[in-house]
């Protein structure tokens, strides 16, 4: 069998191994529980704008949460 055929066969075997069983069985649940939510209320407004944050931090919005965070810089 050529190397291309072997790679194709290996690809199909990999896909087959990753498929969910068609018998309708779900994968077993992972052990443990989710930790409690952080103690912040669901909607917190720590800041109103960048200038209400200390130093170089920015006022970042995440849904209804406004909090001061260190900025990231993308090249």
From Swiss-Prot:
Localization per record: Secreted
Tissues where this protein is expressed: Expressed by the venom gland.
Alphabetical keyword list: Antibiotic, Antimicrobial, Disulfide bond, Secreted, Signal
Keyword check for Transport: no
Gene Ontology terms, MF aspect: serine-type endopeptidase inhibitor activity
GO BP terms in the entry: antibacterial humoral response; innate immune response; venom-mediated disruption of cell wall in another organism
S-S bridge residues: 34-60, 43-64, 47-59, 53-68
Domain WAP: 27-72
Entry GO CC: extracellular region; extracellular space
Main localization of the protein described in the UniProt heading: secreted
Domain of life: Eukaryota
Position of the signal peptide: 1-24
Signal recorded as keyword: yes
SUPFAM superfamilies registered for this protein in UniProt: Elafin-like
Family per record: Belongs to the venom waprin family.
Function per UniProt: Damages membranes of susceptible bacteria. Has no hemolytic activity. Not toxic to mice. Does not inhibit the proteinases elastase and cathepsin G.
Name of the protein: Supwaprin-a
Source species of the chain: Austrelaps superbus (Lowland copperhead snake)
Taxon lineage: Eukaryota, Metazoa, Chordata, Craniata, Vertebrata
